[in-house]
């Protein structure tokens, strides 16, 4: 940043361009130099002559003439007197525009504080003087005295408490001290003057050094905080001239006394105008009233002082003056705002600039535009993709200047006046010229709300009659438009550059893909889908079936002559191959480009298939082919939707016959459940849940029945079925409401009403049912309204935080990346690896796990084909470049971003990716739900909540798993964490018996086997191995990673597997709870039926070392007995198409070298066809088991006090149950005393049932007690939009879990102040201590090993903790998977990279931990870029650089903390931002979009990026 020259802004010559913008405090001299005269009178204009009063607020002498080049009295009129000052009225002859820029001033009799620097926290004046804000206000408003010189004064008679400099005294203290110490130099005053003097006398440098010393001396955190606050303000003042030019007067740093105002600037009058309304009234800007109050009070004060009025009156007047100035700057900051004549508070200068209606957002960021119009839209089915219909009347207005020029050019009119007359009369020549003007001149259409870039697109206008704009049906999806009265705005681009941009970038035929996901957005919908679907249907036995046709022409003739039905199955030749198809599908084929393969069109085409077709055509054929293809598709769809004559009638709605039976059955079940509840066998929560389950399943059964009926009806040509099946309109759920039953309804609070609506719409609803229905409908409407506002606000915050992210360079050269794998939630896949990798650049080579060769090199851009190969290769995780790890100085580099999804190519420098990301995330916000879901208070009984079973084949490995045998001989899991059951297949087997050795060298892990004679080594990549914390389920996923079952130094037998690939894993406690029963043994094979999955030839292999040896003598019916058996399916070129591992005990179903189909089962499991269950447990209770043998004793467990006795009626057994509410300090505990002095303690939760008695002898693994899971209070799951905004705002959750910061062993220490103390001791001797509230449920046990990042208590993981403990990459994984879960759950596809861009902005600031020799202060939040620049500067000078840690800021905080003053001020908290910036003399280098829009410069993206790099041309030698 070289030294900038200050640009003087002159009235007539405004600077064309500038490089930076600085905010500073203005000194009184500066204000005077701006002023053109003092405003002395409060008058505005003379009500009779309507001329401004002299010396008043609108005075022409000070501010300039009212009319152009004309003085007030009229002596000088005309241009030629420019610059002359009239002798009579004193007005300078000039352009009247100067009234917008000339300022005046008011000389205040007494200094007045600027309210921003007093009242906005932290109070700057107070901080500098070291006075509390409240006290400072008392001094300024003449209620208290401030000590100017303490002299030798003491507060008490014993002279112990000294009066300090800047102490604040009340009246009584002041009088007392004055009497005693007046002669010894004591002096105190009140009001603005003394504050100004105190500020003027401050020696900032000395204060700075003093504060730094104090900072070093103190140990108290609170003191440090206040010192740092003062330090910041002092440093800001001292550094406020760092970048100014040394020779100009700007070089003086800001002075503290400038925060007090002695000369008050007066705004130029045209910026606070008086507007004459009809009827002789005036509309006055509020600022004028506020100025009038200031002037009145100032003049009155002047008079009183000249008259030598009593002190008390003068004080009062000074206070009133201070209040008047306060109101002018920020009315309403103090308690009582000044009200105007109409009883509403006056709008002060602060209010004018802030808020939605303020200057920034209303006039600078959004302006009204010339050459624009709006009208209602109607559909224009005849238009081409890039056309829109523009009403002639509108075109006439919009293109008027062009038209005038055209009329003159063609000689139809000789003067402009004549041309205007012609246009008014609308002669034929006018229309002729209009056609020519409009041709080739695109217009832009925009539909509000403009949620993403596709809401503004360019079209070539076609002139139409009528008054409505015609819109192409396919672009409706992008605009989110429909034709129920929507309006759109038209804008005309004027400059050649704008026209070119419209034609090249914004034309609708260029915007086929959605920038959010890369899917095509111009997909036919509704009628068009229906037409094409109808065309592609096949009807058995239709007229002309099985005919042979030569081609499309013959088919069309046959259809015309009625001897062939459109749905008839026919045979024909395509590309020299005979195929069977239908007449309709051939018609579809006739509009397709030639390169579309048969399997894309020769089938029933539903909406998804049509979308895939469009995507395919775009990927293969490019823009032009796609645009014309879409138009043909649209025409075909509309034509056949019309010819099909599909309509809805009541007869199409078919009610299932056995509906009544099903309903009666359900009612019977409900009665039974109600009875069990009445008997007290089940809780009310269980009753409610079960009843709802019954009705849900009844509804599902009926819906299935009904769909079957509708599908069979008219051989699949039932109108309603066709609409739903094709995806044109409606869904199975809606049809089921029409034909089966309406189903369960929700109450306004989101809970489900347990009586369903049994009727359907065809039968009609009764009154009660109708009433229940209306709830839902109304809630829907209310929700939508709220949702729109919330989603809009989220978008605005995202835009603001990401607006400065753009692609600046091609490649930043980093080798760093983030490892990604598929995102799963509760075993369902949310986003596959293939989807996540698409359009990204690899940060590391991808190694094929089978051949060990490099599949894709580092730096490869993954397109669809490559992503598909990757998906099929079985690779589970890949390292990719991301915006978070990008090392570009500013912005992001193209390689770290990847493909620009809107056009499917690598992104180009200059692309505003930040804005696109924010739009992509914000735009679907309106489709997300608003609700937080309430989950009931009972445990659900799904299978997955009772057991886990293997889905793949292989053999079992236990990782760290300990088990106890109980009385029945079952194996019970004894670990509470850090253990897992793995399903693996072998990758390397030992060639001979020997000792294993494992060593890490850089990025490699070397596994060697050695006996007396020989040694072999296998090299693995470190990052392919599963890490301990991944195996324990703390972070990442383990599928496809390698596992080493042996440690160094162990003896290993021959043919033993020493390196294994993990196929599935179940960790304790997330997938297998503590005390579950394990049903498999370590090393046990797991057999499944294996389908081939590919066509080809079977070849069997066995693993030797790390290579495969061919085995040929394999026959059908063999049972595999050896580890490491594989089968490979080879394709016709003898390349490997697919490989399967065959576990031991599998039965082989085909001989070696036999040819098979992809659907054949090649390996059968042994007779038991059940899936292999790995573990199972009690679904309703958390079980507590004994870990040692011993004797039980009770602590704090007493019937009738902390527990109740229950008698089981069936068995007559008595058991104790812990009460739900316990007295404070009571902790029911079971203690088992074992051998010696070994004892284990178990704290019991409320509602726990105890199965043992005091003094019982028990054995290891016995069940002591069970806590019902239902007792866990029902949690509200935040979902939908609130969840997204919670994540982006990085809010600390209310019930955040405490998380371990280091790996280590847990120890419980003595409780401290009723908090539990947990200490984690790491192996290297470090330890971390945690104090945990009693209310939290602790999830760890004494003596357990725990990984960093695991929860110590229940609760939600806070994203701040993830960042602090596990680092940025883990945060990246956490945030993206959480946000994607919400969007994918609603069926919205957003590419990860958009979320990454926002996350990279949330991480753009760091917190200084140690400031070294830099200018930062400990605890400062600074942007990474500033931090890096400052450190580089210090290192160059040989100093000590600063150290910082990353922080995660919510999007609002990140946007306000922007490096750019203007963009932060225009976002939120305007006054606060401007206050800070002015004191520090902050520079805004105008690098981002928003500040350039505000200042009206070209924005630095796209072509504007190159405008910054001024190009110099040299002549060739």
Swiss-Prot record:
Cofactor detail note: Binds 1 Mg(2+) ion per subunit. Binds 2 Zn(2+) ions per subunit.
Enzyme class at the top of the EC tree: transferase
Residues annotated for Mg(2+) binding in this entry: 482, 484, 486
Domain of life where this protein originates: Bacteria
GO biological process: DNA-templated transcription
InterPro entries from the UniProt entry: DNA-dir_RpoC_beta_prime, DNA-dir_RpoC_beta_prime_bact, RNA_pol_asu, RNA_pol_N, RNA_pol_Rpb1_1, RNA_pol_Rpb1_3, RNA_pol_Rpb1_3_sf, RNA_pol_Rpb1_4
Known cofactor(s): Mg(2+); Zn(2+)
Annotated binding of Zn(2+) 2, by residue: 812, 886, 893, 896
GO cellular component, one term: DNA-directed RNA polymerase complex
Tagged with keyword Transmembrane helix: no
EC code(s) of this entry: 2.7.7.6
Protein function: DNA-dependent RNA polymerase catalyzes the transcription of DNA into RNA using the four ribonucleoside triphosphates as substrates.
Subunit structure: The RNAP catalytic core consists of 2 alpha, 1 beta, 1 beta' and 1 omega subunit. When a sigma factor is associated with the core the holoenzyme is formed, which can initiate transcription.
HAMAP family: RNApol_bact_RpoC (MF_01322)
Official protein name in the record: DNA-directed RNA polymerase subunit beta'
Native species: Campylobacter jejuni subsp. jejuni serotype O:2 (strain ATCC 700819 / NCTC 11168)
């Amino acid at each position: 940043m070289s030294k900038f020259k200050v640009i003087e802004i002159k009235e007539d010559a405004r600077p064309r361009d500038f490089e930076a913008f600085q905010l500073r405090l203005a000194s009184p001299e500066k204000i005077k130099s701006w002023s053109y005269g003092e405003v002395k009178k409060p008058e505005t204009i003379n009500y009779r002559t309507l001329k401004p009063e002299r010396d008043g607020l609108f005075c022409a002498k000070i501010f300039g003439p009212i009319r152009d080049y004309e003085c007030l009295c009229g002596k000088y009129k005309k241009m030629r007197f420019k610059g002359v000052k009239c002798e009579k009225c004193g007005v300078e002859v000039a352009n009247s525009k100067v009234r917008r820029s000339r300022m005046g001033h008011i000389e205040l009799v007494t200094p007045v504080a600027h309210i921003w620097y007093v009242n906005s926290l932290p109070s700057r004046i107070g901080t500098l003087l070291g006075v509390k804000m409240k006290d400072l206000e008392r001094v300024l408003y003449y209620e208290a005295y401030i000590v100017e010189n303490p002299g030798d004064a003491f507060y008490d008679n014993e002279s112990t408490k000294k009066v300090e400099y800047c102490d604040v005294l009340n009246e009584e203290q002041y009088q007392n001290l004055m009497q005693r110490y007046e002669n010894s130099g004591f002096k105190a005053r009140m009001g603005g003057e003394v504050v100004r003097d105190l500020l003027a006398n401050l020696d900032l440098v000395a204060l700075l050094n003093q504060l730094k010393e104090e900072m070093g001396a103190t140990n108290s955190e609170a003191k440090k905080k206040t010192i740092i606050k003062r330090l910041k303000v002092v440093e800001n003042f001292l550094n406020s001239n760092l970048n100014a030019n040394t020779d100009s007067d700007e070089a003086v740093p800001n002075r503290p006394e400038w925060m007090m105002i002695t000369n008050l600037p007066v705004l130029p009058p045209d910026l606070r105008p008086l507007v004459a309304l009809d009827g002789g009234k005036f509309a006055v800007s509020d600022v004028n009233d506020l100025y009038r109050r200031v002037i009145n009070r100032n003049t009155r004060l002047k008079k009183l002082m000249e008259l030598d009025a009593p002190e008390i009156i003068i004080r009062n007047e000074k206070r009133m003056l201070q209040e008047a100035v306060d109101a002018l700057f920020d009315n309403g900051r103090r308690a009582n705002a000044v009200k105007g004549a109409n009883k509403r508070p006056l709008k002060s200068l602060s209010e004018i600039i802030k808020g939605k209606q303020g200057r920034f957002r209303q006039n600078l960021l959004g302006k009204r535009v010339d050459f624009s119009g709006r009208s209602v839209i109607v559909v224009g089915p005849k238009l081409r993709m890039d056309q829109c219909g523009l009403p002639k009347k509108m075109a006439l207005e919009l293109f008027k200047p062009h038209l005038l020029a055209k009329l003159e050019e063609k000689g139809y009119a000789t003067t402009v006046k004549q041309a205007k007359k012609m246009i008014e009369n609308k002669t034929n020549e006018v229309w002729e010229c209009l056609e020519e003007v409009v041709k080739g001149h695109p217009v832009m259409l925009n539909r509000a709300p403009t949620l993403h870039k596709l809401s503004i697109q360019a079209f070539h206008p076609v002139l139409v009659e009528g008054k409505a704009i015609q819109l192409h049906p396919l672009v409706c999806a992008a605009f989110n438009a429909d034709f129920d009265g929507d309006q759109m705005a038209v804008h005309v681009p004027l400059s050649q550059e704008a026209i070119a941009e419209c034609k090249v970038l914004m034309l609708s035929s260029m915007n086929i893909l959605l920038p959010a996901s890369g899917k095509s957005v111009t997909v036919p919908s509704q009628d068009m889908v229906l037409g094409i679907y109808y065309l592609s249907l096949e009807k058995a036995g239709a007229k002309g079936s099985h005919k042979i046709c030569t081609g499309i022409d013959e088919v069309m003739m046959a259809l015309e002559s009625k001897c062939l039905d459109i749905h008839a199955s026919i045979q024909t030749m395509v590309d020299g191959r005979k195929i069977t198809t239908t007449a309709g599908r051939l018609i579809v084929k006739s509009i397709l480009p030639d390169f579309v393969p048969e399997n894309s069109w020769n089938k029933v085409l539903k909406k998804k298939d049509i979308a895939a077709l469009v995507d395919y055509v775009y990927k293969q054929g490019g823009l032009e082919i796609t645009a014309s293809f879409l138009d043909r598709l649209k025409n075909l769809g509309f034509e056949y939707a019309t010819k099909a004559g599909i309509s809805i009638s009541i007869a199409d709605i078919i009610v299932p016959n056995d509906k009544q039976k099903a309903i009666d059955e359900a009612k019977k079940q409900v009665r039974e459940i109600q009875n069990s509840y009445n008997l007290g066998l089940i809780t009310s929560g269980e009753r409610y849940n079960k009843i709802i389950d019954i009705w849900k399943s009844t509804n599902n059964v009926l819906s299935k029945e009904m769909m079957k009926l509708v599908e069979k009806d008219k051989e699949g040509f039932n109108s309603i079925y066709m609409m739903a099946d094709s995806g044109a309109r409606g869904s199975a759920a809606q049809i089921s409401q029409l034909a089966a039953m309406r189903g369960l309804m929700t109450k306004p609070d989101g809970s489900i009403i347990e009586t369903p609506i049994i009727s359907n719409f065809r039968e009609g609803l009764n009154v009660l049912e109708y009433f229940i229905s209306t709830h839902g409908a109304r809630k829907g409407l209310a929700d939508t309204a709220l949702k729109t506002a919330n989603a809009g606000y989220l978008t605005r915050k995202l835009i603001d935080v990401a607006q400065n992210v753009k692609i600046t360079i091609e490649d930043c050269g980093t080798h760093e990346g983030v490892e990604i794998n598929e995102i799963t939630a509760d075993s369902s896949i949310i986003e596959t690896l293939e989807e996540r990798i698409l359009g990204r650049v690899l940060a590391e080579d991808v190694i094929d796990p089978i051949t060990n060769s490099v599949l894709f090199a580092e730096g490869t851009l993954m397109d669809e084909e490559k992503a598909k190969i990757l998906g099929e290769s079985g690779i589970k995780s890949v390292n990719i470049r991301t915006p978070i790890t990008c090392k570009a100085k500013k912005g992001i580099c193209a390689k770290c971003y990847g493909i620009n999804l809107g056009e499917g190519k690598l992104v180009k420098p200059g692309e505003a990716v930040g804005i696109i990301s924010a739009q992509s995330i914000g735009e679907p916000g309106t489709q997300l739900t608003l609700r937080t879901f309430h989950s009931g208070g009972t445990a659900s009984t799904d299978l997955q909540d009772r057991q886990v079973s293997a889905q793949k084949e292989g053999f079992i490995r236990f990782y760290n798993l300990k088990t106890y045998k109980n009385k029945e001989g079952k194996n019970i899991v004894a670990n509470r964490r850090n253990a897992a059951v793995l399903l693996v297949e072998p990758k390397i087997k030992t060639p001979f018996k020997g000792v294993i050795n494992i060593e890490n060298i850089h990025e490699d892990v070397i596994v060697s086997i050695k006996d007396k004679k020989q040694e072999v080594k296998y090299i693995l990549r470190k990052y392919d191995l599963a890490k301990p914390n991944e195996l324990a389920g703390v972070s990442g996923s383990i599928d496809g990673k390698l596992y080493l079952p042996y440690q160094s130094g162990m003896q290993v037998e021959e043919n033993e597997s020493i390196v294994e690939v993990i196929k599935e894993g179940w960790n304790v406690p997330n997938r297998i709870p503590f005390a579950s029963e394990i049903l498999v043994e370590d090393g046990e094979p797991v057999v499944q039926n294996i389908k081939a999955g590919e066509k080809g030839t079977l070849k069997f292999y066995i693993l030797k070392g790390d290579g495969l040896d061919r085995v040929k003598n394999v026959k059908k019916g063999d049972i595999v007995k050896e580890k490491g058996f594989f089968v490979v399916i080879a394709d016709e070129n003898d390349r490997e198409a697919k490989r399967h591992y065959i576990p031991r005990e599998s039965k082989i179903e085909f001989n070696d070298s036999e040819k098979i189909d992809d659907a054949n089962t090649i390996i059968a499991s042994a007779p038991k066809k059940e899936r292999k269950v790995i573990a199972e447990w009690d679904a309703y209770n958390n079980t507590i088991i004994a870990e040692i043998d011993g004797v039980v004793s009770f602590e704090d467990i007493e019937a009738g006090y902390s527990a109740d006795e229950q008698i089981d009626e069936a068995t007559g057994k008595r058991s104790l149950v812990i009460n739900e509410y316990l007295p404070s300090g009571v902790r029911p505990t079971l203690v088992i005393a074992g051998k010696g002095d070994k004892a284990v303690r178990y704290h019991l939760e409320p509602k726990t049932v105890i199965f043992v008695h005091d003094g019982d002898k028990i054995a290891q693994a016995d069940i002591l007690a069970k806590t019902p899971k239902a007792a866990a209070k029902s949690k509200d799951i935040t979902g939908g939009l609130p969840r997204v905004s919670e994540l982006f705002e990085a809010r600390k959750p209310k019930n955040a879990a405490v998380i371990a910061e280091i790996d280590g062993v847990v120890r419980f220490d003595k409780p401290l102040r009723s908090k539990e103390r947990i200490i984690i001791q790491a192996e290297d001797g470090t330890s971390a201590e945690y104090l945990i509230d009693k209310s939290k449920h602790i999830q760890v046990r004494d003596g357990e090993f725990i990984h960093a990042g695991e929860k110590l208590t229940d609760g939600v993981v806070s994203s701040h903790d993830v960042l602090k403990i596990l680092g940025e990459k883990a945060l990246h994984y956490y945030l993206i998977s959480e946000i994607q879960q919400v969007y994918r759950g609603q069926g919205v596809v957003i590419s990860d990279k958009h979320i990454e861009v926002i996350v990279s902005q949330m991480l753009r600031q760091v917190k200084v931990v140690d400031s070294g020799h830099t200018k930062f202060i400990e605890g400062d939040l600074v942007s990474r870029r500033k931090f890096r620049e400052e450190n580089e500067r210090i290192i160059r000078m040989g100093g000590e650089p600063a150290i910082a840690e990353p922080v995660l800021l919510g999007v609002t905080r990140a946007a306000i903390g922007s490096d750019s003053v203007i963009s932060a001020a225009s976002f939120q908290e305007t006054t606060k931002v401007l206050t800070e910036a002015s004191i520090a003399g902050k520079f805004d280098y105008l690098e981002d979009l928003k500040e350039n829009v505000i200042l009206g410069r070209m924005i630095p993206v796209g072509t504007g990026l190159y405008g910054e790099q001024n190009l110099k041309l040299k002549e060739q030698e």
